Amino acid sequence: MNEKALELQQKVQEKVEVLKKQGGFKILEGIIDGKKGIRDMNPKSEARRSAFLTDEDKAEKRRQLKSELEVLKELVEAGSLTEATDKAKSKSAEIAKLLKDNLKNIFKNTQDLEKAYRSVDLFFRNADEQSIRNLYFLNIPLEEFVSADNSNLREELTKHFDQNYDRFSLEDNYSLLVIPGFLGESLDYWSKQASKYRVTLVTDYTDELEFESIEDNIEERKIAGDARYLANTLVTCNYAVARQRYEGIEDDDLYLPMSIPLAGKMYSGNGIQPSAGKKHGKIDGVLGTRLPLLRTHVDKIDKMGMVPIIYEKEWGTVAMSDTTLANESTDPDQRAIGVVRAKDWIAKVLLDYFNSLTFQNFDGRLREEIKQQLNKFFDKIKGHGKLIESFSIDELKKDPDNPQAVLVSINVKPYFATKHYVIDYSGTQGSFAHEEK
């Protein structure tokens, strides 16, 4: 061993003797977090120390401990207590800034992923189910649905829907298509697809910071109308707070569109009963809404053909309409989503049933059997708390112009959810008397 090495060894030994007088290795154990490996370096346990220095699974702990010791070394070398304190404060501020910057980047880079997972969580919460059958996720960004140039996506989805709807048995057909976010110019296309396959499209309007922006945008390009295919589309308006911001790291709370949780509500609800209002439209798992909508705002949004999402302290976050995009239709059945969904479901049941009867001779026996089955089916879904108020089988006979066709005419009267209560009240002689004392 050369002279320089001996001198270094002597200095190290002197420092060790000083440490022993001050409390030994316990000083380091008291300064450095034990989770970072300092206890593993205690010289009293040579085997533990050796394992810590050589095991591959301890590499991260060794890196953390080295970093801590380097900081401690800098403080010891600072000289006076004042210099050491100033250096510690400077180092702490530097590390705090680095941590803050890293957290900002983490939240920014993982925001889309967080939104996706939180949205799925909201669906399950509002569906009130731990396990859901026949639920499919498409890992496709909104931009792909918005783009009219993405013919491949449109072709593949059309093919997929055909595979499940263009069949004699409709047991695997879809009932909901949920596309969170605003579809822009492509909203019309996806509405037509939903109508074609008797599916309810649930989507959203843009995330606006003030109500006036919604009015201006709708005035410039309205999305509602009277076309039949618009009756299968539900558009929510007003984003909700999924999580409050982390102070000093994020500039704003985390907001999510409400199409997914509303679809969860619709999945678990009664077909004719819309997921709207205080009792049936409460969205679970959110903290409030972007816009504090008033009743006048709600009425205007409803007339725009959208479902306003409101927040009331006693109610929570609530969907406050059952209107479809076909809110300008003269047919009230097309304006209420509960009625649209109920009639679509009934139509699918009838298609499935009559498909199973094809190529049977239509004689008196079969005619009577069909009538019995139809009466039995409609009786099950008729009455309070069910889908329809009444029904009538108006026609069930052979087509006089086509011997291989049978004409079936059924009329149903669905239940409608109450949107307004018109109150007319008066007191004695048409006015309320008020006597001041």
Mark where each language-model region is.
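Acidic, glycine-rich, low-complexity linker/loop segments at the periphery of domains that act as short
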Residues: 2-25, 301-310, 386-437
